Amino acid sequence: MGLLDAGITQHNVLITSVDNVLNWARLSSLWPMGFGLACCAIEMMATNASNYDLERFGIFPRSSPRQSDLMIVAGTVTMKMAERVIRLYEQMPEPRYVLSMGSCSNCGGPYWEHGYHVLKGVDRVIPVDVFVPGCPPRPESLIGGLMKVQELIRMEQIGLSRADALKKLAEKSVDPQFVIERERKAAGA
């Protein structure tokens, strides 16, 4: 539900809740900070290129954690790098979200069994809101994950915890490939 879907009275007065206005503003101007560590970073960069154009979703990448509300961890997180991931996460203002992109950041990837130096998932050091699977995931998958973050923001309420919002999001899950194909068809028509 967008802000314009709310009720409008005869005198052009918008009637909605404060939650809806705040959530609409936050999801319409998502500022991610990419933390590219391996081959997933190449796919993340491709997603920011003109072929996929993330700005049409209101997503504009930032280079500073103090200006970001979303951290995209893309690639292999080693034990030494985990400290820096935590530091950057702590520098982000609230509300902050984390998207884990790729098998390596999700669960250690091909290094999970024999890589003593690899963190077995970035969720062991910072809370992760959305996981994007793949090795490396395609840009379409990352866009689907970003749309999941936007849905999570849309479902947040002042009295609702993030865990409850994540449960509601899981119940309303939609295949991201379907959404991308629908947008491509609409753009071509």
Curated annotation (Swiss-Prot):
Listed under GO cellular component are: plasma membrane; respiratory chain complex I
Q: Membrane topology per the record?
A: Peripheral membrane protein
Gene behind this chain? nuoB
Where does this protein chiefly localize? membrane
UniProt key word Translocase? yes
Which NCBIfam families is this protein grouped with?
A: nuoB_fam, PRK06411.1, PRK14813.1
Q: Which domain of life is it from?
A: Bacteria
The text of the family note is: Belongs to the complex I 20 kDa subunit family.
* GO biological process, any: electron transport coupled proton transport
Which key words are in the record? 4Fe-4S, Cell inner membrane, Cell membrane, Iron, Iron-sulfur, Membrane, Metal-binding, NAD, Quinone, Translocase, Transport
Spell out the subcellular localization from the entry.
Cell inner membrane
Subunit (UniProt)? NDH-1 is composed of 14 different subunits. Subunits NuoB, C, D, E, F, and G constitute the peripheral sector of the complex.
Q: What is this protein for, i.e. what is its function?
A: NDH-1 shuttles electrons from NADH, via FMN and iron-sulfur (Fe-S) centers, to quinones in the respiratory chain. The immediate electron acceptor for the enzyme in this species is believed to be a menaquinone. Couples the redox reaction to proton translocation (for every two electrons transferred, four hydrogen ions are translocated across the cytoplasmic membrane), and thus conserves the redox energy in a proton gradient.
Annotated InterPro entries: NADH_UbQ_OxRdtase-like_20kDa (IPR006137), NADH_UQ_OxRdtase_20Kd_su (IPR006138)
Question: Where do the annotations place [4Fe-4S] cluster binding?
Answer: 39-40, 104, 135
Origin organism is Pelodictyon phaeoclathratiforme (strain DSM 5477 / BU-1)
- Protein name per the record: NADH-quinone oxidoreductase subunit B
Q: Name one Pfam family in it.
A: Oxidored_q6
Report the enzyme's class at the first EC level.
Answer: translocase
